[in-house]
């Protein structure tokens, strides 16, 4: 999501054309401008850019939207070295936008708020040693957490219990 070539959404130009065509319709009542630039954004610049695009749409169309849906929420910090979004600055950015706009804001809570609510608990069954690399075999599978295999997502691994028990070497 978030790019012109993606399957969802419209370009700003196309949206303005449709808004002009339908804003005086007796059958269609446009009440919401909905945008979605992505769901794993961890810095403020894309949000600033998004709000500037929304401002331009409102200025160009002179249309009063009852709601503005800002789409996906803030990204989650999957790795210790990844960027973490500053909630205070994000809040100030939205408040600044609202000072000049009377629309009600809608947005998803985002992974940064809800993503840590779940965890996968697994145990090591055995370790497979090969000439090129070693594999830790768990009692969990891709159906439990497909994201790393599907698109290389990273998740922290935290041992719940550390013991020095030997794990059998099966091949």
Task: Identify the role of each PLM range.
Residues 1-67, 76, 93, 125, ...:
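Active-site-proximal beta-alpha core segment in soluble small-molecule metabolic enzymes
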Residues 35, 70-72, 107-109:
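Conserved beta-strand positions
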Residues 39-43, 74-78, 113-116, 144-146:
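Flexible loop/turn segments at secondary-structure boundaries
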Residues 43-49, 78-89, 115-126:
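Short glycine/threonine-rich loop-to-helix capping motif typified by GTGT followed
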Residues 62-64, 99-103:
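Short glycine/proline-enriched coil/turn segments at helix->beta-strand junctions
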Residues 69-79, 84, 97:
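C-terminal extensions
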Residues 88-98:
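Glycine-rich and small/hydrophobic secondary-structure elements
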Residues 93, 102-171:
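Charged (often Lys/Glu-rich) extended helix/loop segments that serve as interaction or gating elements
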